[in-house]
Amino acid sequence: MQPFSPIFFHLLFLLNGLSSRAAPSPGQPVVADLQGMLQPSGMPTGTLENLTRDQPTPGSSASHPPEHSETPPSASPHISTKILRETPSPSPFLSLETPIPDQLTSVAESQGTSQMSPSRATLGKPSETPKPDPTGISPSDSPETPKPNPSNTSPPESPESVYTDPTPTLHHESPEISKRDTPKLSPGEESKIPSPRPTQFLSSKSLETYDPSATRHLNSALEPTTHPDPTESPQSVFLTTHNSNPTVVPQTQFPTSPSQNVTETARTSDLEPSSSLPTQPTTFREEATTPSEPGLSPSPEAPAVTRVATPGLSTSDSPGTKELHVPQNSDPKGPDIPLPSARIAGPPAPLEHPNQVAPAPQRHSRGDTVNTIIVVERVKETGVTLVSRPRGSVGGALCLFFAGTGLLIGIFLLLWCLYRRASRHRSFAHHRLRDSGDEPVLHLDAPKDPLDLYFYAPDAWVPSHIATQPPPSTPPLPPKLPPPPRGPQRLEALSPAALSPNFF
């Protein structure tokens, strides 16, 4: 991921520049700047040289292709992109035919920019063997894949051969796409990244497919780079980035043509591998936006024009948008794909309709709830106990609590009253004090008769002997002892020698 981070920053910068749709001529200096910026990042000098060789002659797209073909299968995506971009030599007249100024009308500039594209420079470096002209390219150009028949014999092998009908339009579109792709891809990126940007492959593919003669040859050249399963998806050859542009063009031009089915099937297979590429969203965006107009007019120029308008928008798209468009384009429906915009509008409408339908069920459910409420009310009317149950659950607990506390308090009060009454009628030892206010010290010297301990009524009669008898006298003190000796006492050693013989 480290090599990709600088590439993303450069791509964002280039996309911002492309959003304004500046003339292709300024695009070349930008490419030169990109080369200068990216070369320190590890781009080989050979790539820059190839790029400079590509720059001088925009019309030399046919001459440069010889660099392309013999790249290992890992570099095959680069090769395919270079073949595609260089092949569109016939594109100049097509681009001239298209009146739209958005395409950067000068075909020479567009081709020049496509040659200047770092993807070509990078591709030139990886491809060590010269590549024959796209028109003259034979299936032998693709060492790995079986050569496709130039006459569109096998649509699965060569997805572009199916697109031979829209080739003029695609051709016109391809130079523009190559221009857009040129600033996006930097030579450093291509040299470092085995899988070129999806936009590069798409633009190159569109260039190839757009040339009636070149498309066939390019298909043969591109197939080596693609999966060994050409039959499943003709565009699987372009797994990473080729699929979106060529598929979009056939959709816009010939929504009804059987070739669209092939292209869409290829696209579906290709979209999955290519979704990882950050730049591919632009191509998907183009597919989604352009098909609305081109589908209406099968004329080659109109789809090309729509392409021209869409590329600027697609370049500004972020990889997140790619994901949004990919599922739409991935549908295998050939005739329906030309109207992706209609399909995009379609899904929301069905969603809205279900939303509208949903309220009705909700209303019905509300009616059901009302009916249930009525039933509950009837129950309340018939039996009030049901209504009181919730209150009883809460209030009953409180009632029980207060009732229990009240009972306990009443019990304690009753016991206290009984105690007081019993204490008044019967006095026992605990009532020895004449008055509750008297201090116990006053009665310490009271005579302690057996009766006093058990029965004593101060309020009642007082025994005479207790009242008249004087208190007993204190006992006499013991005799005084002699005072203790003063001073230290003399100690005698108690030893056998000190003892007298008569001591026992």
UniProtKB/Swiss-Prot annotation:
Intracellular or extracellular location(s): Golgi apparatus membrane
Cytoplasmic side: 419-504
Biased composition (Basic and acidic residues): 170-192
Membrane topology annotation: Single-pass type I membrane protein
TM spans (from-to): 398-418
Gene name of the record: Gfy
Keywords carried by this UniProt record: Glycoprotein, Golgi apparatus, Membrane, Olfaction, Sensory transduction, Signal, Transmembrane, Transmembrane helix
Bias kind Polar residues: ranges: 42-57, 103-120, 198-207, 232-283
Glycosylation sites: 50
Name the UniProt record assigns to this protein: Golgi-associated olfactory signaling regulator
Mutant phenotype after disruption: Various olfactory phenotypes, such as abnormal localization of ADCY3, shortened olfactory cilia, and reduced electrophysiological and behavioral sensitivities to odorants.
Ranges facing Extracellular side: 23-397
Physiological role: Required for proper function of the olfactory system. May be involved in establishing the acuity of olfactory sensory signaling.
GO cellular component term, pick one: Golgi membrane
Sequence segments annotated as region (Disordered): 36-365, 467-504
Signal peptide: 1-22
Biased composition (Low complexity): 150-161
Listed Pro residues bias regions: 469-487
Tissue specificity statement from the Swiss-Prot or TrEMBL entry: Specifically expressed in the olfactory epithelium and vomeronasal organ throughout development. Expressed in both immature and mature olfactory sensory neurons in the olfactory epithelium (at protein level).
Gene Ontology process terms (BP): non-motile cilium assembly; protein localization to non-motile cilium; sensory perception of smell
